[in-house]
Regions:
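Membrane transport/envelope proteins' first extracytoplasmic loop
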Residues: 2-235
C-alpha cells in the first residue's frame, strides 16, 4: 500500500507549466476583469452621485410639486381658497414666442420665456451672466448647444433682437418637453429662457400663459402618496 506522502500529484508540475505557457492569455483575462470591475464600480458611484444631486436639487431650487394653467389670472381670494388645501401657490407666468436663432429670416424654433424666478423653480446659471437689461436673455444650455448659439450672440424673438448673456437650466425642465403629453423632448426647436421683469413685459399679453405652480406644506413620503395628493388637489 502506497502512503499519501509518497503519492505524486501530476498537477503540481502541470499547472505552473500551463500557466507560464499561457501567461499572455491569463494576463488579458485578468486585465479584462479588472477593467470591467473598475467600469461598473465607477458607473455605480457616478449614478449614485447623480441621483443624490438630483434629489438635493428639489430643495435647493424649491422645485414645484405640480402646476396648472388658467384662462385668466387668478385673483387673491381664489388663491387664498386654494391654499386652504395645505399648499402654497406661485404665479409662474410665461410667454411663448417664435424665434429665429440664426437670424436667417426663417422661424426655426419656439422659446418659452419666464421672468426672473426667486421663490419657486429657481434657475441654475451654467455659463455667462444673468440678464440685466430688457433686451437680454438667458437660454437653455442644451438648446444653445444644438443650435450653435453662444454667450454674446444675438437671437431674434418675435421681431425683437435679444442678446444672449447666459446659458441656464430651469429646475422644472430637466428635459425640454413643451407639453406633458409629448413622447419625446425637443432641445432643437424648443427652449425655455429667462429675462428681466422689464424685458418679459415687453412681449405684452398676446401670448401670455397664466401658469401656476404649487408646493405642499407637508411633503409626500413617496411617489404613490404624491400622486394621490395631486389628484385630490386638482379635483
Amino acid at each position: 500500500m502506497v502512503g499519501g506522502e509518497d503519492m505524486k500529484n501530476p498537477l503540481k508540475k502541470r499547472l505552473p507549466r500551463e500557466f507560464i505557457g499561457d501567461f499572455g492569455k491569463y494576463l488579458v483575462i485578468f486585465l479584462f476583469m479588472i477593467g470591467t470591475i473598475g467600469f461598473v464600480s465607477g458607473f455605480l458611484v457616478a449614478d449614485d452621485s447623480m441621483l443624490k444631486a438630483y434629489d438635493e436639487s428639489f430643495e435647493k431650487y424649491n422645485v414645484e410639486d405640480g402646476k396648472f394653467e388658467t384662462a385668466e389670472e387668478l385673483d387673491e381670494s381664489t388663491i387664498n381658497v386654494l391654499e386652504q388645501e395645505k399648499v402654497k401657490i406661485y404665479a409662474n407666468y410665461y410667454v411663448e414666442e417664435d424665434t429665429d436663432c440664426d437670424r436667417d429670416g426663417d422661424i426655426d424654433s419656439t422659446i418659452r420665456i419666464f421672468p426672473e424666478r426667486k421663490d419657486v423653480d429657481r434657475v441654475c446659471l451654467m455659463k455667462g451672466e444673468w440678464p440685466e437689461k430688457a433686451n437680454e436673455i438667458a437660454i437653455d444650455r442644451m438648446y444653445a448647444d444644438n443650435n450653435k448659439v453662444k454667450v454674446g450672440d444675438t437671437i431674434e424673438t418675435s421681431g425683437k433682437e435679444l442678446k444672449v448673456t447666459g446659458l441656464v437650466a430651469l429646475s422644472d425642465y430637466s428635459a425640454l418637453f413643451s407639453d406633458n403629453g409629448d413622447m419625446m423632448f425637443d432641445a432643437v426647436k424648443f427652449s425655455v429662457a429667462i429675462m428681466t421683469e422689464e424685458g418679459f413685459e415687453t412681449f405684452g399679453d398676446v401670448h401670455l400663459h397664466y401658469s401656476y405652480a404649487w408646493t405642499y406644506n407637508e411633503k409626500p413620503e413617496d411617489d404613490i402618496e404624491a400622486k394621490k395628493m395631486a389628484e385630490d388637489f386638482m379635483k
